Structure formats: structure tokens, C-alpha cells
């Protein structure tokens, strides 16, 4: 059946034949009218119906291109006659700045690909699109649709207009005049109503253009978006939080001594202070490179700066070097910004003026900070503590005590950790005058009154991480207004709308900052080499803050042997060369903003920097898809944790008030601020520990689940934040209280949320290694529970770039214990969200603590325990799988199986994690043996060393030892090599008492704690006594005689031989298994090949039989036809001869009448003629059938193989 119909299109006397699918013509109706505008996108069916209504195209076609069609316009063009792309709008261009960036795709109608689409985006307003469609069979007729699709808030109203990020086009349209901007923006916003912050329903495009001209002077281009949501059109005082992902704070690309700009937005425009004199020449200038200053700039201000010098200060009155402070106070932005409805808590009426402080340290003799650990790309890729400010990571604490005291609750603005990754990647941070940080520190201070802190309460100061130096006071102004302001690296909730500061708006100031520095300050910032290559393109150009997105980067990369890496704002991640010119990497986690992206090699940077974007998620509404589900919002999750604990505490208070169970223990300390920095987990742990002794309650009612919890339990939230100590404490609570259904519902490692994600899935997706290992050791079944998309935790960890976490869990999964860990069995889980029974309660290990490091906290008697590493200095390599064990000794491996499981040497060389308990007391099982699998590799290496150190005379086969000990010692005095190579044995024997053993400590024949362990020199002296003449007379009987050395050598050979045989046996077994697999696969291959061959032969035979049969039929029909034809010819000949033959002689008497004779002949003739005609018709019909059969046989048959 023909599936395509031909349609002729008459086009100015040209007839064009178009083949369209018949199904398409049948299912789509013809449109009598083309709408001139539509404020929504057309469906594929509507587009196709417009394009197949060929008879109306002459009426609908536009003969000339329209200049700047308004929003919603639908126009039909003929691309051969009209250049429709020249419409007067400025569209987004590619990185070369020449060609327009277009997105192409094919569209389906009723499952058939018949449409082609080409999309472009406006360079001024990114929500304004031009979409062009045409039929694949008729590409000349193009349907063009212009539409502005604004981002919608949760309330359903349109968010404020958003402008594009930094690009080459932005520099062009910012140079336009007011009339040109009006001409561009007016048609874009046709038919759109915006909600404003002061409650008005409409806005004026003229106000918008005026605001653009005011906030973006015609100077160097600003580097971030001009967020127009920061004020109202009138005098409205409603506070506002812009939830648009286009409003960003730039994370600067700076060196350790370069400028670090952290902008703290504000909700209201500040009042302009008077203009002060310019910068004094005697003030020391900050050093920066052009690249760092340009990439750390933000949107500028329309007014000049207030510049005031401040006297240098030092701690304790001493002046060991000056600290010059430069205060740059920015002026207000214009009012009239458009604001949607605020969703967060309002704040008091502020009186702001924003100041930018440049602190230039000039102390060259400050003590250096402790060096940072060795750089590891996987550590930066996966660790939540470097370059990532959510998930419980350690942020940068402010260096000013006044600011610490005034630090107000704000988790969204808490990050500001641009110093953290740069210090980790480039070396130790510089020290300040009094031992704190030294260097150029840019920050923005909001000089608000202290009334803002009334609604929140003063929060306790957040302790700095252990490696950070003590803070030093540095007053910013003579009036000391810091104490009344907000924290320097944070602000109150909702204070996020102040337009960021732009250094690029002030070229004179930048020129002074880039000029020569004071001679006492070195300049470690490397200058870019002019030979750096250029990144031609990279995709995608943005990621969410959790990272893990695959990024492809194109450029002149051709060396396969080069070790490439990609640097995202000083966070280096490994990159692989997919093909010549294309690099692949996975972006790390980072805070929201624009960051620099650079390709580096072994020697240093290989390319110039480009801008990569981290976009914030919109968490005010629930994620609608599984792909957006495993994401994180600090503030919301921490609030959920506190709300859950508050519900449980209320429940306990109700039961205590009803007199069911007396409430025990002290009241929980109030947690005043929701989600401050590193101390939040510690405060929540204290709160949970205070609830444990008074939690002996049982109730039939369950906790109320609110909608923000997304079906996540308390353990889900703790795992998502990476709170390992909180998970530990919750497991201890679960082990104490085993009969509570409410607690089981909240603390169950097999519980799932709305998208079937377990707590382990959350920890793996967000890269929290310690939390993931704790949850895995708690219940291994969680590793095999997929989410609603069928993804397992390990696959999610791999796909998000958390490679080290996935390897650690795979290693733990391979080390399946032969004995079950001593976990106390809890009752089967009856949680409604989980259909699995869970064995999820760990028993209290000895002293009731669920310590992470109890198996590795043992130390020799009399020696202090190893100092724990601070959490900020621990690398991923330090966190071996065994270190994160929950105190349960692993099952012993076989002797020879160790080499496959541990290739990095004994675990005793790894540093220990800090103990999980707050009081720092070591558990009772601290002296328990370490992992048993250390012994095999030591025994093998010991045997090897013994064989190498044994003298050659001992190794001979004809060895005969002398009976006298003295003689044997005299013979061995020349064996200097033995004493030189036996030092390893001394260190081994020194630690052999602490190596694990398969017998319990109670079965040992002596008390371990009562015997003093000999030191290494003692062992060396004992072992070297057999090769030197020292102490021969006293210790002759204690040294190793020749026979003993021979026995030791034979034992070492036996061990080595057994190990080699075992390795050979394992290799032989593997080869036999491989051979069996190959044979089985080959047999199956041969069997399948024979089956396929037989099938092909059968198919050929069938086709041959069909061909023979058809040929025989045609041959038989042809033969019958020829016989019939010959018979007809004979009949005709006989009839003709019969007609010519003369009649019989005339008989008078017996003759018939002439009339009767004529009628008889006529009847005979008629019968013969009828027979002949019938035969001819039959022959003609058979000839037609034969011809049709021959035509069918002549056609190529697709199924036949020749």
C-alpha cells in the first residue's frame, strides 16, 4: 500500500511536488486561519497543520521581513524570497562573537519525524526566543514564532525581568542609547504583566530602561546580572528575596595574595554619602593581576566612591608592621526594581551604607600556617569540605571577633568560601600581623544598625577549624561600626538583594590597585603566558552547586601522554582526552556563581580562562522529577531536622505531662539559629543526646509528616547533610529505644522517601564518605535498594563524580565478613514507607559508644595515642575503608587473599580519625587487635627479607654447622651484610606485639600490659650480636647459631615456596576457569553458527522450491496455450477447406428442401463460431495472467539472498 501522497503546490506558476506521509495528511486538519500572535508555544500538531495547509500559504506569506516583531507574533516566510533572520533583534552569539547560537532539533507528529526546529535566544532578555519551524519535505516555507517566556514564581506570577550574564553582546547593548533600548525591549514585553515588590500590577518599560542606564554606566562591562528585584517602584517597604537563578554572586578567580571579593547583598538601597577625596598616594596598594581583577568584578554602581584612609592597627598595641585599610563605600542603586513576593522572614528597617574594605597586610615576618596536605583531584571532586559549602562542610570563619559575635542566622549566605579552595590548592594561607590571616582581603560590610539582630538573637560565636589561626581585630572605620553590623561573610535571612560591587566600573581605581605594590610584599601571582591556547567551546556551560556534571572542552589538546586537568576556581579535577581536541571532566561541587575554568597540564596552565556558571536550584517548590530530587538546600534541610526534633520533643513532653512516664534528664538546650556553619551538627548532637535518657516512651500515634519533608526521615536529612556524628548518635538512640514505632520510623537505614531513596542513596549522591560508610556498615541491604528510576547508590555516586566514595563502598562490599558483626538485632521494621525488615540497631560497643575509630585508636603502653587530624585537613586518601569502620572488627581474610584486597601496605601506617565521643575518652576495646589482614603481607615480606639477609654459606645445600657456639660466632664475624640488612627485623619485632592475632587477648599466655616492649635498638643489638664480637661471652647462647639461621632460612623458603605454589595454583585455576569459559562459549558459538547455517540453507531451499514451482506453472500454462492454439489453427483450416469443397451431386428424388438445407448449415456455423470465440477469450485471459506472472517474477524480491 502506498504510504505517501503527492501534493502539488502552486507557487507563482511553479508546481512543486511534495511527498507527505498519508497518515500525516489524514490525522491533521487543515487550518483556515493563521493567528497573528499567540502568547504560548504551538504544539507540534498545530505547527504541522499550519505548514501543510498549502492552499492558504499565498495568503499567509509575508513578502518582507518585519523589524522587531512583538511578543507572540507568528509569521510565515518563504526563505528563498525573504531574509527573515534580519529582524532587528540582538540574538545570543557563540563564543567567537560572530555567528548566532542556534539550537536545532527534529520534531515528531504522530510518531513521525516531519518537522525541523531552529531556536535562538535574545542576548538582552534570555527568556525571549525566536523559534522557526519548517517541514522536512518543504524547507522553503518557514513558520517563525517570537515569544517571551518569563520564569514563574511559586505564587504563579511572573518573576522580574532577567538580563543575560556577561558576554560580548552585553558590551554592545550597554552602549546603546535610551531610544534603542526602548525599541528592543518594548516589543519583547508586549502582553506581559509583571508583579512588583510594592504590590502594583504593571510596570513601565521606560522605568526599566532608565534603571538599566543608571545601574550600568557606559564603561567596562559589569560581570554579573543587574538584579532588578532589589527595590520597589514606590516607597514600598516589603522585603524581598530574589529566587531567580540569574542573580549571582561571582566567586572570584584569585591567587592566595590576590583580591578576594565577597559581596553581601542587601535588601534596600543605601543612602548616598558625600563624595570624599581620592585615594592618598601614601596608602599601600593591593597587588592583583588583570585576570584576577577582571574575573572578580561584579555589577557596578552609578555614583562615585567614598574613599577614606584608616590608620594601621595591630594587636595588643604593638606595631610589628602596618596594616593599611582602604574603605570603599559604594553608593545606592536606583529605586524602582521589580520584586516578586518574599518567601523568607522579613527583617527590621535598615539604614544601610555599604563599604568595601581592602585590608593590605605588610608584615613579612609572620609565622607561616601549617602546610596543606598533598593535592588529590579526587579529594577536591568528592570532599564536601573543599570548594563546597553545604553538607556540613567547614566554611571560612570571619577574622573579626566583633563580626563573630554579630553573626546572624543565615545558611544561604554562609558559604562565601572563596579562600578555602584557593588555600588548599595553592599552599598555606598567609598569616596576619598577630598570627591570623595576612594578605589582601576584600569584603563588603553592611553598616546597619543593631536593630536587625533583635528578631534573631545573638548567636554564639562559631569556632574556627583547628588549622585556622586565631582571629585578630582589625577595625574597619574609626567609628567602629563593625560591632553593630552583620557578619562579614554572612547576613540575616533575606538580605540578599544588594547589587554586587564592580571594580571594572572604576578603571582609575583599578589602575591604582594593579600598580606596583609596597616593596615588603612579594607578588606570587603568576602572570599568564602569551603562549596560552584558547578554549574554543565547552558544554554544558553551567551546573548545579553539587557538581558531578560531565563537561566536554574543545581546544588544541592532542597529546595523549599529557596528564590534563581542569581547574574550576582553583579546584583541579582530572580530565581525560576523549579524542584529539576534546577533553572530558566532571565539575566539582562549588557555591553558586560564575567561576573561572582553565585547562592545565603537568607544567602549569595550558589555556586562558573562561567563565563557568554554577546555578542555584529553586527549592521553594518541591522537585517534580527524580532527576532533581537528590539535591540539597542547607537552610531547608536544617530547618527540617530541627522541626523533626521539635516534634519528638513535644511528643515526649505530652506523654510526660499525661503521667505515663516521668520525664528524665535535663532540658535540651535551645538551638537558636537554624543552620549556622560547622557548629550546627554539634548542637543538634547535644540536643539528641539530651533527649536519649528521657525517651523511654511508647505511643500509638505517629509523628506528623509535613509536606516540606518530602517523605524523608530524620536519618535521611542527616545523611543528606553528611552529619556522621548525628547518624552515630541516632543509631545509639535506636539501640537504646527499641520499642518505639515513631523512633523506628525516623531512624531506619532502610526507610525510603517519596522517590524510594534510602539515607545511603542521599549520602552517596552528595558525596559524604563518612556518612555513607557508617550507613553501609549499619545495614548492607541499603546498598542494593534502588530508587524509583532503578539506580543503585553506587551508580549514583559514580555518575555524580564521587569516585573515591564508590571505590570505598565497593571495597567494603568485597570484604564480606564470614561472621556477622555483633549488632544487636532490633525488632523487624514496621515503617510504613519500607516494605523490608531491617536489622538496623548496632549494639553498644563496650562503653556504649558507636565509635568510628575504636579499631584504630590503640597505641603501645606508655606511648601517647596518635594525635587526631582535624576534619579540614583529612584527605580522601587518609580515609581508607577500614578507618571508617564502626568499631566492629572485620572478618579475617585468608593468608594468600590479602594481596588482592590491600595493595597499599599495612593499614597501621594510616593516621587515625578523631574519636567520635565528645569527652575524648578512649573506648574499652581500644587495645583490641587491629585488622587481621596485615599479617599475610608482613609474613611474605618477612620471608623474603630473611632469604635475602641470610649469608650464602648458610644457603648452601652441603651446609654443616659447627657444634661450638664460639666457633660459629667467630665464623660469622665477617658477615657484615647480615647486620646491615637486619635493621628491618628490629622494627618488625618492635611492633609484632601489636599486630593482630587470631586469638583473643584473654587466651594469651601472658599479660600484655605487664611486659615492657623492647625498643628497636635493643632488637638491633640482639640481632647483630650474632655477627659481631660484642657481648659474645654473655649472650653466646642467646644469639642465632648457624643451625638456627639455617632453620630460619628453611622456614622462610617454605613460606615463600608455599606462597609461590599458592599463586601458581590460583593462576592455574584462573586459567582453567578461563579455558572452560572459552570452550563453552566456543561450543555455543559453533552451535549457533550451525543453526544459522541450517536456517540459511533451509531458506535458500525454500526460495528455490518456490521459484521452481512458479516456473513450472508458467511453463505448463504456456504448453497448454500452445496446444490450444494449434487446435484452433487446425479447426480453422478444416473449416475453410470444408467451405471450399463442392457439394454432393444433385439428387432429385431424395434431396432436402433448399430452405431446410440453408438453416442446417447456418446452425453448424454458429456453433463453430461460438466455440472459436470462447476459446479465443480463454486464451486471451490466460495470456494476460502469464504476462502478470512474468512481471511479478521479474521484480527483485527483498527476502531472497543471491
Curated annotation (Swiss-Prot):
Signal peptide: none annotated. Residues 1049-1078, 1102-1131 form the IQ domain. Pfam families: CG-1, TIG. A motif (Nuclear localization signal) lies at residues 79-86. It comes from the Eukaryota. InterPro entries: Ankyrin_rpt-contain_sf, CG-1_dom, Ig-like_fold, Ig_E-set, IPT_dom. Gene3D superfamilies: 1.20.5.190, Ankyrin repeat-containing domain, Immunoglobulins. Residues 537-615 form the IPT/TIG domain. It is found in: Nucleus. GO terms for molecular function: chromatin binding; double-stranded DNA binding; histone deacetylase binding; sequence-specific DNA binding; transcription coactivator activity; transcription coregulator activity. ANK repeats lie at residues 712-745, 757-787, 791-821. Residues 270-283, 365-374, 460-476 have a biased composition (Pro residues). This is Calmodulin-binding transcription activator 2. It comes from Homo sapiens. The gene is CAMTA2.
Amino acid at each position: 500500500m502506498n504510504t505517501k501522497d503527492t501534493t502539488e503546490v502552486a507557487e507563482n506558476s511553479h508546481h512543486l511536488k511534495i511527498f507527505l506521509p498519508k497518515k500525516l495528511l489524514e490525522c491533521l486538519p487543515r487550518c483556515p486561519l493563521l493567528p497573528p500572535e499567540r502568547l504560548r508555544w504551538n504544539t507540534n500538531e498545530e505547527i504541522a497543520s499550519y505548514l501543510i495547509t498549502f492552499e492558504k500559504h499565498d495568503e499567509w506569506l509575508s513578502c518582507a521581513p518585519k523589524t522587531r516583531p512583538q511578543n507572540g507574533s507568528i509569521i510565515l516566510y518563504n526563505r528563498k524570497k525573504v531574509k527573515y533572520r534580519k529582524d532587528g533583534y540582538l540574538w545570543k552569539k557563540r563564543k567567537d562573537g560572530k555567528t548566532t547560537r542556534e539550537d536545532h532539533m527534529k520534531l515528531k507528529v504522530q510518531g513521525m519525524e516531519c518537522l525541523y526546529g531552529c531556536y535562538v535566544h535574545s542576548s538582552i532578555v534570555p527568556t525571549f526566543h525566536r523559534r522557526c519551524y519548517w517541514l522536512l519535505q518543504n524547507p522553503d516555507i518557514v513558520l517563525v514564532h517570537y515569544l517571551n517566556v518569563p520564569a514563574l514564581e511559586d505564587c504563579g506570577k511572573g518573576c522580574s525581568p532577567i538580563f543575560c550574564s556577561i558576554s560580548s553582546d552585553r558590551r554592545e547593548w550597554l552602549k546603546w542609547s535610551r531610544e534603542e533600548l526602548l525599541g528592543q525591549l518594548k516589543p519583547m514585553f508586549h502582553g506581559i504583566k509583571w508583579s512588583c515588590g510594592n504590590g502594583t500590577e504593571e510596570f513601565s518599560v521606560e522605568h526599566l530602561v532608565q534603571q538599566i542606564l543608571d545601574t550600568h554606566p557606559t564603561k567596562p562591562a559589569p560581570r554579573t546580572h543587574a538584579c532588578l528585584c532589589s527595590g520597589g517602584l514606590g516607597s514600598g517597604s516589603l522585603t524581598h528575596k530574589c529566587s531567580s537563578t540569574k542573580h549571582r554572586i561571582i566567586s572570584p578567580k584569585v591567587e592566595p595574595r590576590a583580591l578576594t571579593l565577597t559581596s553581601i547583598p542587601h535588601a534596600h538601597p543605601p543612602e548616598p554619602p558625600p563624595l570624599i577625596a581620592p585615594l592618598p598616594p601614601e596608602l599601600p596598594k593591593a597587588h592583583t593581576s588583570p585576570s584576577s581583577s577582571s574575573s572578580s568584578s561584579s555589577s557596578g554602581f552609578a555614583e562615585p566612591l567614598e574613599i577614606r584612609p584608616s590608620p594601621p592597627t595591630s594587636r595588643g598595641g604593638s606595631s610589628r608592621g602596618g596594616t593599611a585599610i582602604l574603605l570603599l563605600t559604594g553608593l545606592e542603586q536606583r529605586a524602582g526594581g521589580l520584586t516578586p513576593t518574599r518567601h523568607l522572614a522579613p527583617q527590621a528597617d535598615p539604614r544601610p551604607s555599604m563599604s568595601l574594605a581592602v585590608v593590605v597586610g605588610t608584615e613579612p615576618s609572620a609565622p607561616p600556617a601549617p602546610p596543606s596536605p598533598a593535592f588529590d583531584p579526587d579529594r577536591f571532586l568528592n570532599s564536601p569540605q573543599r570548594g563546597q559549602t553545604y553538607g556540613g562542610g567547614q566554611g571560612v570563619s570571619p577574622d573579626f571577633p566583633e563580626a563573630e559575635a554579630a553573626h546572624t542566622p543565615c545558611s544561604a549566605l554562609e558559604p562565601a568560601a572563596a579562600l578555602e579552595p584557593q588555600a588548599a590548592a595553592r599552599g598555606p594561607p598567609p598569616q596576619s600581623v598577630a598570627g591570623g590571616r595576612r594578605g589582601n582581603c576584600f569584603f563588603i560590610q553592611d553598616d546597619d544598625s543593631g536593630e536587625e539582630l533583635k528578631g534573631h538573637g545573638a548567636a554564639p560565636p562559631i569556632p574556627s577549624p583547628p588549622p585556622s589561626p586565631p582571629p585578630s581585630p582589625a577595625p574597619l572605620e574609626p567609628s567602629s561600626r563593625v560591632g553593630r553590623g552583620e557578619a562579614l561573610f554572612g547576613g540575616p535571612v533575606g538580605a540578599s538583594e544588594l547589587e554586587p560591587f564592580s571594580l571594572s566600573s572604576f578603571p582609575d581605581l583599578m589602575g591604582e590597585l594593579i600598580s606596583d605594590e609596597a616593596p615588603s610584599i612579594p607578588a606570587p601571582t603568576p602572570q599568564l603566558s602569551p603562549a596560552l591556547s584558547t578554549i574554543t567551546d565547552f558544554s554544558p556551560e553551567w551546573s548545579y552547586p553539587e557538581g558531578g556534571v560531565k563537561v566536554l572542552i574543545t581546544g588544541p589538546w592532542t597529546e595523549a601522554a599529557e596528564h590534563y586537568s581542569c581547574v574550576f576556581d582553583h579546584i583541579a579535577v582530572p580530565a581525560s582526552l576523549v579524542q584529539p581536541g576534546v577533553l572530558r571532566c566532571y565539575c566539582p561541587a562549588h557555591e553558586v556563581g560564575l567561576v573561572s575554568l582553565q585547562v592545565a597540564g603537568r607544567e602549569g596552565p595550558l589555556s586562558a580562562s573562561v567563565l563557568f556558571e554554577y546555578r542555584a536550584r529553586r527549592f521553594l517548590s518541591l522537585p517534580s522529577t527524580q532527576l532533581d530530587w537528590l539535591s540539597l538546600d542547607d537552610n531547608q534541610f536544617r530547618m527540617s531536622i530541627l522541626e523533626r526534633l521539635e516534634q519528638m520533643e513535644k511528643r515526649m513532653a505530652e506523654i510526660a505531662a499525661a503521667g505515663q512516664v516521668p520525664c528524665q534528664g535535663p532540658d535540651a538546650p535551645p538551638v537558636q539559629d537554624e543552620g549556622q556553619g560547622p557548629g550546627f551538627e554539634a548542637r543538634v548532637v547535644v540536643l539528641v543526646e539530651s533527649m536519649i535518657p528521657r525517651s523511654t516512651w511508647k505511643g500509638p500515634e505517629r509523628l506528623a509528616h509535613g509536606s516540606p519533608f518530602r517523605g524523608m526521615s530524620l536519618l535521611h536529612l542527616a545523611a543528606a547533610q553528611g552529619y556522621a556524628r548525628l547518624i552515630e548518635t541516632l543509631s545509639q538512640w535506636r539501640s537504646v529505644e527499641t520499642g518505639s514505632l515513631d523512633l523506628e520510623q525516623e531512624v531506619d537505614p532502610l526507610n525510603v522517601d517519596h522517590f524510594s531513596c534510602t539515607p545511603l542513596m542521599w549520602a552517596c549522591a552528595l558525596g559524604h564518605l563518612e556518612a555513607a560508610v557508617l550507613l553501609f556498615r549499619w545495614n548492607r541491604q541499603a546498598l542494593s535498594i534502588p530508587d524509583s528510576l532503578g539506580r543503585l547508590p553506587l551508580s549514583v555516586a559514580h555518575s555524580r563524580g564521587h569516585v573515591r566514595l564508590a571505590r570505598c563502598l565497593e571495597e567494603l562490599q568485597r570484604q564480606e565478613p564470614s561472621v556477622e558483626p555483633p549488632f544487636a538485632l532490633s525488632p523487624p521494621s514496621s515503617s510504613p514507607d519500607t516494605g523490608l525488615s531491617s536489622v538496623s540497631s548496632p549494639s553498644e560497643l563496650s562503653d556504649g559508644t558507636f565509635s568510628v575509630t575504636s579499631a584504630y585508636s590503640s597505641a603501645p603502653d606508655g606511648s601517647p595515642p596518635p594525635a587526631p587530624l582535624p576534619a579540614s585537613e583529612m584527605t580522601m586518601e587518609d580515609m581508607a575503608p577500614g578507618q571508617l569502620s564502626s568499631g566492629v572488627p572485620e572478618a579475617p581474610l585468608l593468608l594468600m587473599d590479602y594481596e588482592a584486597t590491600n595493595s597499599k601496605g599495612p593499614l597501621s601506617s594510616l593516621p587515625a580519625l578523631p574519636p567520635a565521643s565528645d569527652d575524648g575518652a578512649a573506648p574499652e576495646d581500644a587495645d583490641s587487635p587491629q585488622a587481621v589482614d596485615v599479617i599475610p603481607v608482613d609474613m611474605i615480606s618477612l620471608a623474603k627479607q630473611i632469604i635475602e639477609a641470610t649469608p650464602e654459606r648458610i644457603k648452601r645445600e652441603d651446609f654443616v654447622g659447627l657444634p661450638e657456639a664460639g666457633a660459629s660466632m667467630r665464623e660469622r664475624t665477617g658477615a657484615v651484610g647480615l647486620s646491615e640488612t637486619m635493621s628491618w627485623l628490629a622494627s618488625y619485632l618492635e611492633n609484632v606485639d601489636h599486630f593482630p592475632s587470631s586469638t583473643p587477648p584473654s587466651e594469651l599466655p601472658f599479660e600484655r600490659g605487664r611486659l615492657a616492649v623492647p625498643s628497636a635498638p635493643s632488637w638491633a643489638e640482639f640481632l647483630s650480636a650474632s655477627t659481631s664480637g660484642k657481648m659474645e661471652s654473655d649472650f653466646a647462647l642467646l644469639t642465632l647459631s648457624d643451625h638456627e639461621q639455617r632453620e630460619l632460612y628453611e622456614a622462610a623458603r617454605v613460606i615463600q615456596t608455599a606462597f609461590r605454589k599458592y599463586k601458581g595454583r590460583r593462576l592455574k585455576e584462573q586459567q582453567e576457569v578461563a579455558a572452560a569459559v572459552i570452550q563453552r562459549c566456543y561450543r555455543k558459538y559453533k552451535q549457533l553458527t550451525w543453526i544459522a547455517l541450517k536456517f540459511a540453507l533451509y531458506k535458500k531451499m525454500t526460495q528455490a522450491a518456490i521459484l521452481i514451482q512458479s516456473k513450472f506453472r508458467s511453463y505448463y500454462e504456456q504448453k497448454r496455450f500452445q496446444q490450444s492454439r494449434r487446435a484452433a489453427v487446425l479447426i480453422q483450416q478444416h473449416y475453410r477447406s470444408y467451405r471450399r469443397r463442392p457439394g454432393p451431386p444433385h439428387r432429385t428424388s431424395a434431396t432436402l428442401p433448399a430452405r431446410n438445407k440453408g438453416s442446417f448449415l447456418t446452425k453448424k456455423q454458429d456453433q463453430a463460431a461460438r466455440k472459436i470465440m470462447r476459446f479465443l477469450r480463454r486464451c486471451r485471459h490466460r495470456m494476460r495472467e502469464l504476462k502478470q506472472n512474468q512481471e511479478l517474477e521479474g521484480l527483485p524480491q527483498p527476502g531472497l539472498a543471491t
